[in-house]
């Protein structure tokens, strides 16, 4: 045959002849591989039985039933032994990216855990973003911004109750004789004090009220008003029956006054008080739990400002020959003779004249004119003082000494 002859010619020429692959040998190798796979499956099953985690073999897939691969038929395993499943193998070793620890409770728990973790993560991110966008403001920042004056306007009074440069002018005369707002602004503030209209932010009077609230544009203007007021209030008659309040909350006091003689007239007490402080209300009698008068008077006052600060009332004083005592919260204890706070009058070595009120000599050796201890003017004593109740026309007509 030509084919056989061609092959012989090739052998004669010394060329190697390519032989077809040996199929029976390949089938034998597959059979050997099948036996190796069967042996590994048996080992896995034995390990699973020892651990108690052996699972029933699942039914074969359709691809396996249809005989899509020849390897399954070539296994030739014993009856009842199925191909190993992935769940039958032990957990993968450390470092295997596909390995994971199986939950004994089943895979049904994992979705809930993952969902809860995702929600917690989103909630933390949202809180962090909100904290970054809305930084908590400094306490009181809104109030400070509201009190800050506008840039295009002159500095005015700030919010109510804070930073207001305010005084209150009160009329203490008869209600029917209360002056108008024009008198307070024109005669008192502008003419007597000498303020400029641009220094004043507002002058407020409630209809029917005897109080005038004066708001200044700065603390300097307020200080100027108070300084001039202390000078003019005793010199000019226009300030009679007027008092200025609201200079300092610490200057408001509840005063108690006591005399050994209960016949001292309350109007004389008010006259003496007006020399040293501003009387906000008429003194009233203090009674005990039985309703009996204790001899004390109580009233609300406002201390005045001096060069060194608040000017306090003396703890002891005289109205005529009657000695009176005063006290209030915060009143310093001073010597009656020299006014020192380091000692009392019992140990004081300073001489003081009770006739003229000056230091350095005693009353029997006084060569100066007498000074009234009620009104503070020189030239007459308390008995002849025109401001004393017993010298008033009303007292002479009625014969009442002021009770």
From Swiss-Prot:
Under InterPro entries, the record lists: ZCCHC3, Znf_CCHC, Znf_CCHC_sf
Where do Gly residues bias regions lie? 67-79
Tell me a GO cellular component.
Answer: cytoplasm
Q: Where in the cell is it found?
A: Cytoplasm
Which SUPFAM superfamilies does the record match to this protein? Answer: Retrovirus zinc finger-like domains
Which Pfam families does this entry report, sorted A to Z? RBD_ZCCHC3_1st (PF23057), RBD_ZCCHC3_2nd (PF23058), zf-CCHC (PF00098)
GO process annotations (BP) = activation of innate immune response; cellular response to exogenous dsRNA; defense response to virus; detection of virus; innate immune response; positive regulation of RIG-I signaling pathway; positive regulation of type I interferon production
Identify the stretch(es) annotated as Disordered: 1-158
Residues with the modification Phosphotyrosine, per the entry, are 201
Q: Where are the zinc fingers (CCHC-type)?
A: 335-350, 352-368, 372-387
Q: Where is the composition biased (Basic and acidic residues)?
A: 26-38, 47-65, 95-121
Quaternary structure annotation from Swiss-Prot or TrEMBL: Interacts with CGAS. Interacts with RIGI. Interacts with IFIH1/MDA5.
Q: Function of this protein?
A: Nucleic acid-binding protein involved in innate immune response to DNA and RNA viruses. Binds DNA and RNA in the cytoplasm and acts by promoting recognition of viral nucleic acids by virus sensors, such as RIGI, IFIH1/MDA5 and CGAS. Acts as a co-sensor for recognition of double-stranded DNA (dsDNA) by cGAS in the cytoplasm, thereby playing a role in innate immune response to cytosolic dsDNA and DNA virus. Binds dsDNA and probably acts by promoting sensing of dsDNA by CGAS, leading to enhance CGAS oligomerization and activation.
Q: Write down what this protein is called.
A: Zinc finger CCHC domain-containing protein 3
Question: Organism, per UniProt?
Answer: Homo sapiens (Human)
Which gene is transcribed and translated to give this protein? ZCCHC3
